[in-house]
Design a protein with these regions (language model features):
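N-terminal and secondary-structure boundary signal
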Residues: 1-436
Length: 436
């Protein structure tokens, strides 16, 4: 199939200085061909969550504040007078969300320096959009009402969706109840969030590849310095090129397929007008999936260490971002309880659809959703429900102890503190990219 000249070009630029590198990418993709200096611009970075107890190493997790500032500088040079930055960060701990991320990553100072408005989509009023008979998405009004919406995700892989790029970054514009609904056991995560772009209609997508993240999206991924920027007025075109750079074909990604099918758009990168750098020079395949034991009783390390007794089935696409850290915590705590001998037969469930299996003396249910899903489950001998959305970390540890697992909360804290500082002293990992 030949290149579709009616589609917006997709730019690939190397990042080597600010703001010129981004300027090259925007010029190549004709980013401002439909832009007026009178437009109200909304910038949507990826500030997925904020953790004050165990700070998330920012590389590859968050859109670099440096690139956001570069974009603001270029917009100001163009004469733009009204610029907002909006996000709806997940609250790992209640009350610690978007505003904490704005403060911690320099956005508060950025707003003061350039006269910007910061918007917490979690606090916004919303408009509802029906998708068929089963799905209604509540989207923050500010995300819908700007004249020129700029989507700024990070180049990363993701344990539930393979990649997390432009289409998925828009999930941060949803209200909390709609974010949860996307993880509904009878719906499909990637089908659900693929529709958000139909309503927001981003004018421009800029994918920040200064760092790329493998097996994201929070504390546990591995970041690599990559120094690329992908930009296009076509969100799918940008996502296809970015996915290609980290080893994925468009046909590999379910939410790409859903979006492309509705819009009768090609998933073949060869059909797009790629400008700038040669993509072949920047390809580095990244892993996305976490390995589990063959019998689905725990992460792959359980088999390596010879852990028997407990079962922690692999997460599925119903596990929300809020409960994801709790599920990881349970894995680490069970590891801490292992002293070389078989552990009690305890099953630990999360998400919204896992079903307790027969053969376990006790079943720990992490969160309100999985408690409801197993309310009538006759396979469960003795349930240990840990209520909450998400449940509190200390209550998770207490439930595991009640189940007979001698977990070491100190070992968990040490591990998490290690994740926070894992890039310290390593060449190329520069905190200046996340400060103003």
């Amino acid at each position: 199939m030949s290149i579709d000249s009616s589609r917006a070009p997709v730019a690939l630029a190397s990042y080597d200085n600010s703001p010129d590198s981004l300027g090259r990418a925007l010029e190549l993709c004709e980013a401002f061909s439909d832009f007026s200096s009178h437009h109200h611009v909304m910038i949507k970075p990826n500030l997925v969550a904020w953790d004050e107890e165990f700070p998330i190493a920012p590389f590859g997790v968050y859109t670099t504040t440096r690139l956001v500032e570069d974009l603001v500088i270029l917009l100001k040079d163009y004469g733009c007078r009204r610029i907002s930055i909006g996000e709806g960060s997940v609250e790992i701990k209640k009350g610690v969300g978007t505003k904490a991320a704005f403060a911690g990553l320099g956005y508060t100072r950025l707003a003061e320096r350039y006269g910007l408005e910061l918007v917490d989509f979690n606090e916004s009023k919303s408009k509802a959009f029906a998708v068929g008979d089963d799905l209604k998405l509540h989207i923050a009004e500010e995300a819908l009402e700007s004249d020129f919406f700029i989507n700024m995700p990070v180049l990363k892989t993701h344990g539930q969706t393979r990649v997390s790029l432009g289409l998925k970054n828009l999930k941060g514009c949803l209200k909390k109840k709609s974010k949860k609904l996307c993880h509904h056991p009878e719906l499909n995560l990637e089908y659900c969030f693929s529709h958000i772009a139909d309503f927001i209609k981003p004018a421009l997508t800029v994918i920040d590849g200064i760092y790329a993240l493998e097996k994201g999206a929070l504390h546990f991924g591995n970041a690599y310095r990559k120094d690329v920027i992908v930009a296009s007025k076509d969100i799918l075109g940008a996502d296809l090129l970015a996915a290609h750079l980290i080893g994925f074909s468009g046909k590999d990604i379910a939410h790409f397929r859903h979006y492309a099918e509705r819009r009768n758009q090609s998933l073949n990168l060869s059909d797009y007008d790629i400008r700038g750098e040669d993509p072949a020079a920047h390809i580095k395949p990244l892993k996305w999936d976490w390995i589990w034991t063959e019998d689905n009783t725990g992460p792959g390390i359980f088999a390596k260490m010879g852990i028997t007794g407990p079962a922690l089935p692999k997460y599925d696409d119903t596990l929300c971002s809020g409960c994801s850290p709790i599920a990881n915590m349970a894995n680490i705590l069970v590891l801490s309880a292992f002293k070389g001998k078989p552990l009690p037969k305890v099953e630990v469930l999360n998400g919204k659809k896992m079903q307790g299996r027969a053969g376990y003396d006790q079943t720990v249910l992490l969160g309100d959703c999985i408690i409801r899903a197993n309310k009538e489950n006759g396979n469960i001998c003795h349930a240990l429900p840990v209520k909450g959305c998400p449940p509190a970390a200390d209550q998770v540890a207490e439930a595991l102890r009640t189940a007979g697992l001698d977990v070491n909360i100190g070992a968990y804290r040490d591990y998490m503190n290690g994740q926070s500082v894992k890039y310290q002293g390593k060449e190329g990992y520069e905190s200046r990219f996340f400060a103003v």
